[in-house]
């Protein structure tokens, strides 16, 4: 099973690269343009999709102007089953998304593999209404196999500006065994992480080729990193308060 999982993941990554390259490049272009124009990258996901928002936040080798939207009841640590129920509630997103600082110069990623639940859809609609360029990372196969739970009947891929298909199968799990009654071994986190990091890597090069110094975090475990990172945090702390919440930067 170990070999099979690695093989499946490698095949899956190649599938995404071959089918989504144009969309990946478009996303990278929009990220690059947003940062050059004073915007930031914002991300939102529920449940395990939320993991991806943390993967690219405050990340060694990653972009600095990245703001995850943390809504703890929609994560897993305050009750996993409850978080799934909340994600299915129409209009719940209005309790938090309207208070977020989302601007027309921003790019906003919404992460949901099934793409059917109301909260991610409402978040995408709100970000779009505020003028941000919206990008979904979702599975078209999965989405089209299940009815929407949103009151409009729409799915996530139908309400955003750009769709990056992660090509995950319905139910996310890719392995089977005669003695196991349900599919197992999910893929969406591995694939989603690769998609985001690839998009950001391309955006970094686009900025550099345009003569702009890309805002990149250096690993905090490398000597001199604190000084390097401090100036970037100072630049973006107003737009991304979670960078410094609970910590007073030394002058």
UniProtKB/Swiss-Prot annotation:
Residues 31-214 form the SIS domain. GO terms for molecular function: carbohydrate derivative binding. InterPro entries: RpiR-like_SIS, SIS_dom, SIS_dom_sf, SIS_GmhA/DiaA_subfam, UPF0309. SUPFAM superfamilies: SIS domain. Pfam families: SIS_2. GO terms for biological process: carbohydrate derivative metabolic process. Gene3D superfamilies: Glucose-6-phosphate isomerase like protein, domain 1 (3.40.50.10490). Coiled coil: none annotated. It comes from the Bacteria. PANTHER family: PHOSPHOHEPTOSE ISOMERASE, SEDOHEPTULOSE 7-PHOSPHATE ISOMERASE / DNAA INITIATOR-ASSOCIATING FACTOR FOR REPLICATION INITIATION. Belongs to the UPF0309 family. HAMAP family: UPF0309 (MF_01240). This is UPF0309 protein GK1441. It comes from Geobacillus kaustophilus (strain HTA426).
């Amino acid at each position: 099973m170990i070999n099979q999982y690695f093989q499946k993941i490698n095949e899956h990554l190649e599938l995404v690269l071959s089918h989504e390259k144009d969309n990946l490049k478009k996303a990278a272009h929009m990220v690059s343009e947003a940062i050059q124009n004073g915007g930031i990258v914002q991300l939102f996901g529920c449940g395990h999709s939320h993991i991806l928002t943390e993967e690219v936040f405050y990340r060694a080798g990653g972009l600095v102007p990245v703001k995850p939207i943390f809504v703890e009841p929609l994560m897993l640590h305050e009750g996993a089953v409850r978080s799934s129920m909340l994600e299915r509630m129409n209009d719940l997103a209005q309790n938090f998304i309207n208070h977020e600082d989302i601007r027309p110069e921003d790019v906003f990623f919404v992460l949901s593999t099934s793409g059917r639940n109301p909260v991610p859809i409402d978040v995408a609609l709100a970000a779009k209404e505020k003028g941000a360029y919206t990008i979904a990372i979702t599975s078209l196969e999965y989405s089209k196999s299940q009815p929407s739970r949103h009151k409009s009947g729409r799915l996530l891929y139908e309400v955003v500006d750009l769709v990056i298909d992660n090509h995950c199968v319905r139910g996310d799990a890719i392995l089977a065994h005669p003695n196991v009654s349900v599919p197992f071994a999910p893929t969406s986190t591995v694939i989603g992480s690769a998609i985001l990091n690839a998009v950001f890597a391309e955006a970094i090069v686009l900025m550099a080729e345009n003569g702009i110094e890309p805002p990149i975090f250096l690993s905090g475990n490398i000597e001199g990193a604190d000084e390097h990172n401090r100036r970037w945090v100072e630049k973006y702390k107003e737009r991304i308060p979670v960078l410094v919440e609970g910590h007073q930067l030394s002058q």
